């Protein structure tokens, strides 16, 4: 019963917050402000309601006056919430196209300039790469889940190389981010089983994509995967 109440609160609070954000956007025309609301209003309330504590490590490694392509592992549907909370920038995501069918969420995602990928289309990848590179050239912040799906076991899956090409095309650094604990607070198959716990968000050192030692797409993908994997290793 408690989990059902948590779910009802989460859905109601999210829907209400989105409506408020859309009204604010109509007044201010400031999509970045709407995105920042995810970090200072939506995420903290939802985590408190879930009994989850979020610990952020590594913010000092990043110059937040610049824009980046962030790449993160994917454990749970609350990963986006954790990233909004941890990264102090107006963050846009690449979402699967199925999210366009979710009421309220689709309105917010479109209004804030999120990108969408049709995973069943062979041509979609090239189009999204161009869109992502264009977004990064505009100075926006973008986050990808290069595993392509949520990990059911929590183990890090291989990264798909294609979309990291956007960082090379735009000349922006890639910041690896490791999420640890999201899958325990809200498991992949546990929509009604929210559990209290600790979520750690570890932010890695930016990876350069320009200069004499600049990596190609495959090398960049391997470096990002290795960095995330290292941050997921148990700490003594």
Which positions does each model-derived feature cover?
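Membrane-interfacial terminal anchoring regions of lipid-handling membrane enzymes
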Residues: 1-26, 33, 37, 60-63, ...
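Short acidic-hydrophobic, aromatic-tinged amphipathic segments that line or gate anion-handling sites
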Residues: 56, 115-118, 209
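Canonical alpha-helical transmembrane segments
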Residues: 45-54
């Amino acid at each position: 019963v408690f989990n059902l109440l948590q779910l009802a609160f989460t859905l109601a609070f999210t829907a209400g917050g989105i409506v408020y954000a859309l009204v604010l956007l109509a007044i201010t025309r400031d999509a970045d402000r709407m995105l920042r609301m995810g970090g200072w209003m939506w995420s903290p309330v939802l985590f408190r309601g879930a009994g989850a504590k979020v610990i952020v490590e590594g913010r000092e490694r990043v110059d937040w006056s610049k824009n980046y392509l962030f790449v993160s592992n994917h454990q749970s549907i609350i990963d986006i919430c954790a990233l909004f909370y941890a990264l102090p920038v107006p963050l846009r995501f690449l979402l699967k196209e199925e999210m366009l069918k979710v009421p309220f969420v689709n309105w917010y995602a479109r209004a804030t300039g999120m990108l969408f990928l049709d995973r069943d289309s062979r041509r979609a990848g090239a189009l999204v790469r161009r869109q992502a590179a264009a977004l990064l050239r505009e100075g926006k912040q973008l986050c990808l889940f290069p595993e392509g799906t949520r990990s059911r076991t929590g183990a890090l899956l291989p990264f798909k190389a294609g979309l990291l090409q956007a960082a090379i095309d735009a000349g922006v650094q890639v910041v690896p981010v490791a999420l640890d604990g999201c899958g325990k607070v809200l498991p992949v198959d546990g929509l009604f089983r929210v559990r209290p716990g600790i979520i750690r968000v570890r932010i890695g050192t930016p990876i350069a994509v320009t200069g004499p030692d600049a990596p190609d797409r495959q090398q960049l993908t391997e470096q990002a995967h290795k960095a995330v994997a290292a941050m997921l290793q148990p700490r003594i």
